[in-house]
């Protein structure tokens, strides 16, 4: 596991807005971890560590929360922030079982310049996300679609998108059009 995805945490037993303010005053962020098969866990994380890594995270970044003994596989569910003060007030993490497949919508990243567009065609993007299924640690943050070979009159469907080996398409209709060039 990439060390940039590991966040250290400490458990906390005290709650409420007064205690949350004290935690933030100590350069930490109050947070909560919950999931379908786990109890709610109240934690605090170092503000500097989270802020340094937060800019690189997406909705599909799998993080490992660790207290030195227990590791939890999580996604960021919600971040409460004060934009004027540039402070993160609270983070909600959603825990998943790293041994079970999950379904997620991941971004489609379009790269290259389409031959059809160079010939005067118009590129119409109809979908920017794709539903996939995989183990959490195998989940890509996005998939790339190379537009270079797409000619005028061509279309790209979900089944045309190349996914990593351990990732499966989970769309109901694999023939749905993602983009086309007219």
From Swiss-Prot:
One of the record's GO molecular function terms: 5S rRNA binding
Key words of the record: Ribonucleoprotein, Ribosomal protein, RNA-binding, rRNA-binding
Gene Ontology cellular-component annotations: cytosolic large ribosomal subunit
One Pfam family cited in the UniProt record for this chain: Ribosomal_TL5_C
Gene Ontology biological process terms in this record: translation
Parts of the chain that traverse the membrane: none
Keyword Lipid metabolism: no
Record-stated family: Belongs to the bacterial ribosomal protein bL25 family. CTC subfamily.
Function: This is one of the proteins that binds to the 5S RNA in the ribosome where it forms part of the central protuberance.
Subunit structure: Part of the 50S ribosomal subunit; part of the 5S rRNA/L5/L18/L25 subcomplex. Contacts the 5S rRNA. Binds to the 5S rRNA independently of L5 and L18.
Record protein name field: Large ribosomal subunit protein bL25
UniProt organism field: Borrelia hermsii (strain HS1 / DAH)
């Amino acid at each position: 596991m990439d060390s940039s995805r590991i966040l250290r945490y400490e458990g906390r037993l005290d709650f409420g807005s007064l205690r949350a303010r004290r935690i933030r005053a100590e350069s930490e962020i109050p947070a909560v971890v919950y999931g379908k098969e786990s109890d709610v866990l109240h934690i605090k994380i170092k503000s500097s560590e989270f802020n340094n890594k937060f800019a690189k995270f997406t909705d599909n970044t799998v993080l490992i929360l660790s207290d030195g003994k227990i590791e939890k596989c999580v996604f960021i569910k919600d971040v409460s922030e004060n934009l004027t003060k540039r402070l993160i007030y609270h983070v909600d993490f959603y825990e998943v079982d790293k041994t079970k497949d999950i379904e997620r919508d991941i971004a489609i990243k379009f790269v290259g310049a389409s031959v059809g567009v160079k010939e005067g065609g118009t590129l119409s993007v109809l979908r920017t996300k794709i539903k996939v299924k995989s183990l959490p640690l195998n989940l890509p943050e996005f998939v790339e679609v190379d537009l270079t070979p797409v000619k005028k009159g061509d279309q790209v469907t979900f089944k045309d998108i190349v996914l990593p080996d351990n990732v499966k398409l989970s769309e109901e209709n694999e023939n749905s059009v993602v983009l086309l060039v007219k």
